[in-house]
Amino acid sequence: MLAYLRYNPEVFQGKTILLPCDDPEQSNFTKYFARNFERLGLRKLISTSYAGSGRPRQVSLFDGTVLDTPKRPYEPHGRIAVLDHAICDDDIPWNYMEGNGDFRSKEITALRDEADMILTNVPFSLLQPFLFWAVESRKQFAFIGNMNAITCNDTFPLLMSGQIWLGATQPKVFITPDGDHKSFGNTCWITNIDHGLRHEPVPLMSMQENIAHNERLRRILLERYKQNPNALHYEKYRNYNGIEVPILEALPSDYTGVAGVPISVLNHFCAEQLELVGCSVNADAKALGVREIGGEWIRAYREHGGTGNYTAHMHNLVLLTDGGVPIAPFKRILVRLKAPDTSGDL
């Protein structure tokens, strides 16, 4: 949230925020916006959760406090909290909803249509339907999702068209309700809210500068690709007109063709610097001109001990290096450098 505030200090000013997958009692999203309601200038905060997702509750007969028990009254109903002012403690008032709190229900969809922004940590198994539900609303949104899911056939076109992009940070550590810390390396923010990092170009060197000075690249060319140390170079794909760039910082500044880069490029993607051409592993690979792997590469791959589930008619990007090493790079994002804008130059 701080990245959006730094880029636009009034991003939340006068907004109604919907948190559609956030238990009013336990969600850190809810607590953050409830505590910072006035500072952010919110108009309204709505937090809802699915039936049965909250902490079991029962009122104690002895002291009137709420205790955790196995009993789950009113389980068919979701929970909702609606705030129009700050609440600085964790005792956020809430009520049961008429329905089960599923974000796809008419009840939650009506709240979506009322809101200005949708923010949450959606269950990863529901990421795609939630994404389409959010995009359909034409509202601003940001939610935590799985990095690999955004390159699927149905979701990647939203990236290509500029309807969504990745947030400024990668949430990697999560605190569970019992206090444990869980780490994930492939999570990201999926959003359509602008932030400053989207407009910061990645510093790049020329092809020759990378080969001479980029030690990570040199090590890959020597050790993984088995290249001649006196003739290091960027490898070309065997079945596509483009070069393989195994690490993002090795993208050459003087190469005008298509380059395949790791999916991590989406965390640093600057639309003013790069053109998004496509993804190497979804159904569009063939349409992009990626040819069949072919039997020769398959034979070399098997001879080198490869056990992956590849066939000659697949359209995955592959390399057959000058050192004779068959390589099938993991999921690649295809990009092309844009020409610098010199319209303002004298």
What are the roles of these predicted feature ranges?
Residues 1-346:
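Class I S-adenosyl-L-methionine-dependent methyltransferase catalytic core
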